[in-house]
């Protein structure tokens, strides 16, 4: 009997690891075009002679479709086998990217990028939902973030030379090949039975909805704050008289710090209380925003930019893990996918309006972004009260 009881955890281990591999692999590939946006946009302009408006529409289609994938997922997520959904999304993603590599028609390319991102968004929802079912979601979401940043950084390094030889097709064919390599991992997703199992216990539904609403608001506030500041951080450098080459070098190093932030979060996992980790992460993020005030010199600007990038990638896994504790069915993580896209769109739009209304000054933006980050922290801390969590025990 003792031998059998010791064998069970060992048998469960490969399933947990393979699910983690699927989550990290698919989540890294899906947003790769957005993560490599500077290189891809430059190639689209030079090869296809696209102007800023057309390029902007392409990237808006990618981001918009990934977020809009949430809407059909409300229907299929609780009803369809997640593995079957993953296989279908993988097939559509590969087909759309291969066709994108061969088309020379802009309207057709725009449509194909929308379809590719819709399939990718569905995969991202599956990744977010599957991570919520694991025993250590903090670690899973840390690796989820780290995979995206690492592939994006590698792409920014590799793509210019590949574009020189193969053109824009290198990006789209490369994504199709990477997705094909990851395709067998689709069978590692849960089948989605957790949703029906959770709905069978309705006693805490009202309480869970209230907590879910607070979690969604916290996530939205976090993304509005970070995207509003990060979008215009280059403008802060220019207004401070920092050389573009120097600021570019700082941003390149910041990418590595972003990978380090997510990696640190995944290493810590559940070893420390999540409330303390959120406090530390938000303290770093808000300190970075305040360091950007009043035309920082090079050293202060570099410190702020590096600290900002490290802190937000460190915080994000713990935000997602907080949401995962509230709901394991996938519904809340599905909504989170839409909220992330919304926050990334709302933040820069509001920030631009604030900057324009203040004569180009970013002072008020930085102060308000710090307050919004503090609001996000307060909401998240209110969700950290000890409560039973058998799903991850």
Q: Which residues make up each language-model segment?
A:
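Cytoplasmic helix-loop-helix junction between adjacent transmembrane helices
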Residues: 112-147
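C-terminal transmembrane helical hairpin of 12-TM major facilitator-type secondary transporters
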Residues: 273-319
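Helix-to-loop junctions at the C-terminal end of transmembrane segments
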Residues: 69-82, 261-274, 355
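A membrane-interface helix-boundary motif in multi-pass transporters
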Residues: 51, 161-177, 352-373
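Conserved MFS/SLC helix-loop-helix module at the cytosolic interface between two early adjacent transmembrane helices
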Residues: 68-105
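Helix-loop-helix hairpin linking two adjacent transmembrane segments in secondary transporters
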Residues: 134, 143-191
């Amino acid at each position: 009997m003792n031998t059998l009881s010791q064998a069970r955890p060992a048998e469960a281990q490969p399933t947990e690891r393979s699910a983690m591999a699927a989550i990290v692999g698919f989540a890294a590939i899906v947003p790769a075009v957005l993560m490599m946006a500077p290189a891809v946009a430059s190639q689209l302009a030079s090869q296809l002679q696209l102007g800023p408006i057309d390029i902007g529409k392409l990237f808006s289609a990618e981001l918009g479709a990934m977020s809009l994938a949430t809407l059909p997922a409300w229907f299929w997520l609780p009803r369809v086998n997640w593995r079957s959904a993953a296989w279908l999304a993988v097939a559509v993603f590969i087909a759309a990217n291969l066709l994108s590599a061969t088309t020379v028609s802009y309207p057709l390319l725009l449509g194909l990028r929308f379809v590719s991102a819709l399939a990718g968004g569905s995969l991202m929802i599956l990744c977010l939902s599957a991570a919520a079912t694991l025993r250590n979601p903090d670690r899973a979401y840390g690796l989820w973030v780290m995979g995206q940043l690492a592939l994006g950084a590698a792409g920014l390094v590799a793509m210019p030379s590949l574009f020189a030889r193969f053109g824009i097709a290198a990006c789209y064919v490369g994504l199709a090949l990477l997705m094909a390599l990851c395709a067998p991992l689709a069978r590692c997703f849960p089948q989605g039975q957790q949703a029906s199992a959770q709905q069978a216990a309705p006693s805490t539904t009202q309480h869970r909805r209230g907590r879910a609403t607070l979690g969604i608001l916290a996530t939205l506030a976090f993304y509005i704050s970070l995207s509003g500041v990060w979008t215009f951080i280059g403008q802060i450098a220019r207004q401070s008289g920092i050389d573009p080459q120097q600021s570019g070098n700082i941003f390149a190093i910041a990418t590595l710090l972003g990978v380090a932030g997510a990696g640190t979060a995944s290493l810590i996992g559940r070893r420390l209380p999540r409330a303390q980790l959120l406090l530390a992460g938000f303290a770093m993020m808000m300190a970075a925003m305040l360091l950007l005030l009043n035309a920082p010199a090079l050293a202060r600007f570099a410190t702020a930019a590096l600290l900002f990038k490290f802190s937000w990638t460190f915080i994000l896994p713990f935000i997602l893990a907080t949401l995962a504790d509230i709901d394991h069915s996938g519904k809340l993580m599905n909504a989170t996918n839409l909220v992330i896209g919304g926050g990334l769109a709302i933040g820069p739009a509001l920030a631009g309006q604030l900057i324009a209304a203040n004569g180009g000054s970013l002072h008020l933006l930085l102060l308000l972004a710090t307050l919004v980050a503090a609001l996000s922290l307060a909401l998240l801390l209110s969700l950290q009260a000890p409560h039973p969590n058998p799903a991850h025990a």
